[in-house]
Amino acid sequence: MALPRNVIPMPRSRFLRVKCIDCGNEQIVFSHPATRVRCNVCGATLVEPTGGKGIIRAKILEVLE
C-alpha cells in the first residue's frame, strides 16, 4: 500500500542558480546557507545567512530540484 505524499515531509530548501548583479557570473547556491556566499569572480555577496532562509542579493535564474 502506497503512502500519501503529504505523510512524508519534503525539504523546503532548494539549490538556486543565481546571477551576480555586479559582474554577471552565474553560480549555484543553497537557499538556506550557514555562511555568507560570495561571487567566485568579483567577491560580491550573493546570499547572506539569517538562521533560516538566506537573504538573496542576486537575481534568481532557476530553482533546481
Swiss-Prot record:
Its cofactor is Zn(2+). Gene3D superfamilies: Zn-binding ribosomal proteins. SUPFAM superfamilies: Zn-binding ribosomal proteins. Transmembrane segments: none annotated. One of its GO terms (biological process) is translation. Binds 1 zinc ion per subunit. GO terms for molecular function: structural constituent of ribosome; zinc ion binding. One of its GO terms (cellular component) is ribonucleoprotein complex. This is Small ribosomal subunit protein eS27. It comes from Pyrococcus abyssi (strain GE5 / Orsay).
